[in-house]
Regions:
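Flexible, glycine/charged-enriched surface loops at secondary-structure junctions
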Residues: 14-21, 71, 135-138, 237-262
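N-terminal flexible segment immediately upstream of the FAD-binding catalytic core
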Residues: 1-63, 79-110, 210, 253-268
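Glycine-rich, histidine-containing beta strand-loop boundary motifs that form or position
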Residues: 20, 74-78, 96, 116, ...
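A conserved active-site cap/scaffold subdomain adjacent to cofactor or substrate pockets
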Residues: 268-277
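Short, well-ordered beta-strand elements within core beta-sheets of diverse protein domains
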Residues: 48-53, 218-223, 277
Length: 277
C-alpha cells in the first residue's frame, strides 16, 4: 500500500492535497531559485500535503510520520525565501496557513493568543481596535506567527524591543512523536523552537506580548555620501547619551540600488537616489 493510501485510511477529516499540479505549488517558496537546479539535486515535490484544522489533527500527522520515518516540513506563508519550507526528500508538508485564528486579545494583560498560521497584519489590526499594537513584527507583515518564530526574530522595532523570543509569553508545540506541550521562556525546551525551522516539532499556538499603541510615529531619511559615513553615524548614534531620550524603533540601511528600485516601482522619482540612506 502506498504511503498516501495508508495515511488516508487513518486521516479522518484531515484535508489532503496529492494532485501533482497542486503539490508543485509546495515545491518552492518566495525565493527565486531556478527549478532545474533544485529538482536536479533534491526531491522538492512533497509526497502529499495536509491542511490540519486542529491540534489533534497535527498530532495525528506527526505520529504517522514518526512511525513511518517520513520527513515532515511545516509551512506557513513561505515568505522567508531561503528554502526552509522546500522539501529535499519529498515527505509530508504540513500547511499551517489556514490554522490562523486570533483566539484572544487580552487588554489587561496586553497579550494576543493566536494560532500558528495567524498573520502579523491581522493581529495588528485586531489589537489596535483595543488600543494595542505588536511590539515587533517581520518585514513581511503578511507572514505567519510560527513562521517568524521558527526562522528569525529580528526586524521592525527590534532595535527597541529586542528579539522576538523576548515577547513570547508561551507557546504550544507538537513534538515529532505527536505529543503536545505548552512551553514558557523558563522551560529549557523553549529555545528548541526559536529559529530552528521546525526541526524539533511544530509550533501550533503562541501568546505574544503587546504594547499600547503609540500616539504618533515618524520616519526619517538621512542621506550620506557613502556607506562608511552612514555606518560611522549609526555607531556614534547608538552609543551616544542622547539616544536615551529618543524612542528609536528601527534603523535600516538602504543603498542607491534599493532607492532606485523603489522609485521604479512607484513610477516616479519619489526618493533621492543616494549611495547610502
Amino acid at each position: 500500500m502506498k504511503i498516501i493510501e495508508e495515511f488516508r485510511s487513518i486521516a479522518g477529516d484531515i484535508k489532503i492535497i496529492d494532485r501533482p499540479e497542486e503539490k508543485e505549488m509546495y515545491s518552492h517558496d518566495i525565493g527565486d531559485v531556478p527549478s532545474f537546479m533544485t529538482k536536479m539535486l533534491f526531491e522538492t515535490q512533497p509526497s502529499f500535503v495536509v491542511q490540519p484544522k486542529s491540534v489533534e489533527e497535527i498530532k495525528k500527522v506527526l505520529a504517522f510520520a514518526n512511525e513511518k520515518n517520513i520527513p515532515v516540513i511545516p509551512r506557513g506563508a513561505a515568505s522567508w525565501g531561503f528554502g526552509g519550507v522546500v522539501p529535499t526528500k519529498a515527505g509530508i508538508v504540513v500547511d499551517l496557513s489556514p490554522f490562523r485564528k486570533i483566539i484572544e486579545i487580552d487588554p489587561e494583560q496586553k497579550t494576543a493568543r493566536v494560532e500558528a498560521g495567524a498573520r502579523w497584519s491581522d493581529i495588528d489590526i485586531v489589537a489596535k481596535k483595543q488600543g494595542l499594537s505588536l511590539m515587533t513584527y517581520p518585514s513581511s507583515k503578511f507572514s505567519t506567527v510560527a513562521g517568524w518564530i521558527a526562522t528569525g526574530g529580528y526586524s521592525i522595532n527590534s532595535f527597541r524591543y529586542g528579539h522576538l523570543s523576548k515577547q513570547i509569553q508561551s507557546m504550544t508545540v507538537v513534538t515529532a512523536s505527536g505529543e503536545s506541550k505548552t512551553l514558557t521562556p523558563d522551560d529549557k525546551e523553549f529555545t528548541y523552537y526559536i529559529s530552528t525551522e521546525g526541526v524539533f516539532g511544530i509550533i501550533v499556538e503562541a501568546t505574544l506580548m503587546l504594547r499600547p499603541t503609540p500616539e504618533a510615529s515618524f520616519s526619517h531619511l538621512l542621506y550620506f555620501k557613502n556607506e562608511h559615513a552612514s555606518f560611522a553615524f549609526i555607531d556614534r548614534f547608538v552609543n551616544s547619551k542622547e539616544i536615551e531620550n529618543i524612542s528609536v524603533n528601527v534603523i535600516r540601511f538602504l543603498d542607491e540600488n534599493h532607492m532606485g528600485d523603489t522609485n521604479e516601482v512607484m513610477h516616479a522619482k519619489v526618493f533621492k537616489e543616494s549611495p547610502a540612506v
